Each structure stands twice: as structure tokens, then as C-alpha cells.
Amino acid sequence: ISFAELDFTDSDRLEEQLKQHKLEHGGWDYIIHCAGVTKCRDKADFEIGNYWATRHFIETLMRLEMLPEQFIYISSLSIFGPIREKDYSPICEQDTPRPNTAYGVSKLHSEEYLQKLKDFPYVIFRPTGVYGPREKDYFLMVESISRHVDFAAGFRHLS
């Protein structure tokens, strides 16, 4: 497994980075595309950091003929918005996405873009949440649980 740190904010730089990767390593077997933004000051930045970055990445891969065997896109369950809050039944693939955040909308736009592509090998994963550098929300949740603090996630209290 190798990691590629790419600049999605500059299309020309991204293309140069991918060309360099191709020279040094050849093509890709698989790409796990988990880059993106989860917090932004301006709602438009979600589209830039999630949808447009993904789209430019894929367009550049296609232009440079660097398609992987499989492109794994890390999306989010947030594309569904608040769903099944009463009975908590599982979300399924046939459910209609109804994102209620700019983040969820940007992830859904990326999924819709992928679904429109012809002959592009992709799969979409929708994790419940992410945790890593600069993403502290889930750490706070786990810390609350470890201290036996009751908390609720969601948009309203259900009795």
C-alpha cells in the first residue's frame, strides 16, 4: 500500500503530481479516495473540497489514462439526512437521499457524478463518520461514553 498526498486545489499541480506518480510507480491497482472536507466556514467550500476536488481528480485520471482497477470513493451516510429516527431501522440502498447539510449535499453530488460516468470502475462506501487529524467530534463522543456521560446524536429528542 502506498499513499499519495495530492493537491486538489490546483488542477495543474494535481496533473503534474499524477504524472510524477505514474513515472515513479506506474499505474494504480486501486485508489481509495478519502480526501475531502468535513468542516468549512463557508458552505460553498464543501462543494469545492468534496465534489469539485473529486471531479477534477477523476477527470485528470481519465485524461492521463491512469484508471485504477477500482476507484473506492469514501462518501458518507450524511447523504440521507435524518432518516429512520423513529424506528431506527437500517438504511438501505433503495432509500432516497435527502441530505440536510452542505456536507451531505456535496457528498451526494460526488456520488451522482460517479454514477454518470461510463466505463469508470468505482464503488461507494458510506461510513457513519470519520475520525482523524483535525476531526475531534467522534473523539469527544467516545470520551463521553468512557466517562459514563449520556449523550444523544441527531436533531431532536425522541421519547
Question: What annotation goes with each model-predicted range?
Answer:
Residues 4-6:
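Cofactor-binding loops of NAD(P)H-dependent oxidoreductases
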Residues 8-51, 55-56, 82:
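NAD(P)H-binding glycine-rich loop region in Rossmannoid oxidoreductase-like domains
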Residues 9, 79, 130-132:
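Conserved sequence/active-site signature of Rossmann-fold short-chain dehydrogenase/reductase
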Residues 17-19, 45-48, 85-90, 137-140, ...:
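Short, glycine/charged-enriched secondary-structure capping and boundary segments
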Residues 50, 92, 103-107:
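Active-site YXXXK catalytic motif of short-chain dehydrogenase/reductase
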Residues 56-102, 123:
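Conserved Rossmann-fold NAD(P)-dependent oxidoreductase catalytic core, especially the SDR/UDP-sugar
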Residues 98-123:
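Active-site Tyr-X1-5-Lys
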Residues 117-159:
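NAD(P)-dependent short-chain dehydrogenase/reductase
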